């Protein structure tokens, strides 16, 4: 490692040149990486709802649709608007009554099902827009944007395709502000906590490289989710900042011991790499645990963030040293007083009251452990967006005028008789909450010659070996009511056609709930196991990993229990990923504290003295890192209009503070009280490592 460090110091100008040049392909890769705005596409492909979704897309071209509610518009204007919409690139068809019959025919002469489906309250009718490509495709989103410019007054555009376009527009609008607020808030904390005025700017410049490389290398994944895109910069900044802080502190220490700055940096690089190897591996392992999710959104976030941490470590020991040495004179020239002190008084208090602190903490923890499992969770994208968006208003209008709060798409084989399908429609219509059921057979009736049905209708209701039944529900997606309704409908469908499926946002969200419940357990287990193993290997201990993980898991329990007491509803993805993110991001604090405690014990101090010294000397680093992470994420939470991102960032920011307090107050007390257990369950706990250190330094 020493030879590598010497090479980094010697060729620092070349390293900086290469680092800046690599920003060019990174920018190209970042721009070329597609962003996916549809969470439901991350569901496992073997679920019935996803099988049905594929059939809707491939056979009926209905997976990607939009509904336009038109109120009080004269027929001639409506037909003119319909033609304009059909001319938009990406639109396959705009379906209305005029595609079936002469619109001059009185509506009273139409079948009751058609009247109910096509006409609603407030003198309204409905246009169905079918797109060529999937809802989350760029082609469909561009088409939606164009259609919005063609709508007349009192026209409301709703459906998943429109909501996804709204999501894209909102994320693109807010993303620059997320980055600005995260960088600005982090800089503020760093200016207040570091002596040099130049160092925070170098840190931000140093973090530019791994963040840019991370986004650029996402091109190899093909696409990432908008959630990953929105969180990656903020998380990477917050998670890897402590690596930079650690390198700086080591360099400042070594400068006092070495004859010149280059030697000091070589030593700082070696010691930093040794120190952050365990903490970075635990962070990476925590993020990779998200890959255990069946919902592949977890793999998306996990891979991007694990890659980001790995790149952050590399840039910390390769690029940042080159930056610091290049600007060392300015770093030394411009200095100011800091306001984040060493917590000396707190360190003496904690070491003198260890037992009461741990006992009180356990008592306080119990209600939060109980509460975290009772926190309400929501699963719909609809609920996480501002309610004044075009797609939200339009979708609400569908429910208001047509009773289409949720639409179910039922696919049964086309060898079922007209009578069987009509009977099934009648049974589904009797299910609580179903407002309307439409199928080809329910419209035409048994014995009707389907060759007389217009092709525009046939290709919507029968295609690819399937018959389509559309059932509208008054229940909201993601609720217990609609999930019970779906269970009842599935039983009715399977009784007639064992291979029949039900899909649509309601069915897919129900599957999402079931998958998420399993994922929550799997991710927690795998992240805890991975971190336990890495810490156990690093410290050669059985008890230390249990103690450190328990301290962070306690902080997580408090964080996730607070929403229950405040009556806050969380997005489902937050309940899955927050534990992993908080564990991976803040376990570094506990490793730093424990490493210092170990050093003090080896030096010959008593457990009480070691606890006091470790808290006093680690407090500034932990406070700086924790407050930086808090500032970056709470800033995003404060400005985001998307409830999903706001909730995740608020939980992360609060989690950083809670973990920081637990590590600064509870962990030193716990280490002191468990010292006997640690000594007897840790290999060579009290043996000085100076010989090993000298050996590695020669190597």
What are these regions (language model features)?
Residues 1-35, 41, 91, 135-379, ...:
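Membrane-embedded transmembrane helical bundles of large multi-pass transporters/channels
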Residues 44-164, 376-544, 550-569:
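Structured non-transmembrane domains adjacent to transmembrane bundles in polytopic membrane proteins
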């Amino acid at each position: 490692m020493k030879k590598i460090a010497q090479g980094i110091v010697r060729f620092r100008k070349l390293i900086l040149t290469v680092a800046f040049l690599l920003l060019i392909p990174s920018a190209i890769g970042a721009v070329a990486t597609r962003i996916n705005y549809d969470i439901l596409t991350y569901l496992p492909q073997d679920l019935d709802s996803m099988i049905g979704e594929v059939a809707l897309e491939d056979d009926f071209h209905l997976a990607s649709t939009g509904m336009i509610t038109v109120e009080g518009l004269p027929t001639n204007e409506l037909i003119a608007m319909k033609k304009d919409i059909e001319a938009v690139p990406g639109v396959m068809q705009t379906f209305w009554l005029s595609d079936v019959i002469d619109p001059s025919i009185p509506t009273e002469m139409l079948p009751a099902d058609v009247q109910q489906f096509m006409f609603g309250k407030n003198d309204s009718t409905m246009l169905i827009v079918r797109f060529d490509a999937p809802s989350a495709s760029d082609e469909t989103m561009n088409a939606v944007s164009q259609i919005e410019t063609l709508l007349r007054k009192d026209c409301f555009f709703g459906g998943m395709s429109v909501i996804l376009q709204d999501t894209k527009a909102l994320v693109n609008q807010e993303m620059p502000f997320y980055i600005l607020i995260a960088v600005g808030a982090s800089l503020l904390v760093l200016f207040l906590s570091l002596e040099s005025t130049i160092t925070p700017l170098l840190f931000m410049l140093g973090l530019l490289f791994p963040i840019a490389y991370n986004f650029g290398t996402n091109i190899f994944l093909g696409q990432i989710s908008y959630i990953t895109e929105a969180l990656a910069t903020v998380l990477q900044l917050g998670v890897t900042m402590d690596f930079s802080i650690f390198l700086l502190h080591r360099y400042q220490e070594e400068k006092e011991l070495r004859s010149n700055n280059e030697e000091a940096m070589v030593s700082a690089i070696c010691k930093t790499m040794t120190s952050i190897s365990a903490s970075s591996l635990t962070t990476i392992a925590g993020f990779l645990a998200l890959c255990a999710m069946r919902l592949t959104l977890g793999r998306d976030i996990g891979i991007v963030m694990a890659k980001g941490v790995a790149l952050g470590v590399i840039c910390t020991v390769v690029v940042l040293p080159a930056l610091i040495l290049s600007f060392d004179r300015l770093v030394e020239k411009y200095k100011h007083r800091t306001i984040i002190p060493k917590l000396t008084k707190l360190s003496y208090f904690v070491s003198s009251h260890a037992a009461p602190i741990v006992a009180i903490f356990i008592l306080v923890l119990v209600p939060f452990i109980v509460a975290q499992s009772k926190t309400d969770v929501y699963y719909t994208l609809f609920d996480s967006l501002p309610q004044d968006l075009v797609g939200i208003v339009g979708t609400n209008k569908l429910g208001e005028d047509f009773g289409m709060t949720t639409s179910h798409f039922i696919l049964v084989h086309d060898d079922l008789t007209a009578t069987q399908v009509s009977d099934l429609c009648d049974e589904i219509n009797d299910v609580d909450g179903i407002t309307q059921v439409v199928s080809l057979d329910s419209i035409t009736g048994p014995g009707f010659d389907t060759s007389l049905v217009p092709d525009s209708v046939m290709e919507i209701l029968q295609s690819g070996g399937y018959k389509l039944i559309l059932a509208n529900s008054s229940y909201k997606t993601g609720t217990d009511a609609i999930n019970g309704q779906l269970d009842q409908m599935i039983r009715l469908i399977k009784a007639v056609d064992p291979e029949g499926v039900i899909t649509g946002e309601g069915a897919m969200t129900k599957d999402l709930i079931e998958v998420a419940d399993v994922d929550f357990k799997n991710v927690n287990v795998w992240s805890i196991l991975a971190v336990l193993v890495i810490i156990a290997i690093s410290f050669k201990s059985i008890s230390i990993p249990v103690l450190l993980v328990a301290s962070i898991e306690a902080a997580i329990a408090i964080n996730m229990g607070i929403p229950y007491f405040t009556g806050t509803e969380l997005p489902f993805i937050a309940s899955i990923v927050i534990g992993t993110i908080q564990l991976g991001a803040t376990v570094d604090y506990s490793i730093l504290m424990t490493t210092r405690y170990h050093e003090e014990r080896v030096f010959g101090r008593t457990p009480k003295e070691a606890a006091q010294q470790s808290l006093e000397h680690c407090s500034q680093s932990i406070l700086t890192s924790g407050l930086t992470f808090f500032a970056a994420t709470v800033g995003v939470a404060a400005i985001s209009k998307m409830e999903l991102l706001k909730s995740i960032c608020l939980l992360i920011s609060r989690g950083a503070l809670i973990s920081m307090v637990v590590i600064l107050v509870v962990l030193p007390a716990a280490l002191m009280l468990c010292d006997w257990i640690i000594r007897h369950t840790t290999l060579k706990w009290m043996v000085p490592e100076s010989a090993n250190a000298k050996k590695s330094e020669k190597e």
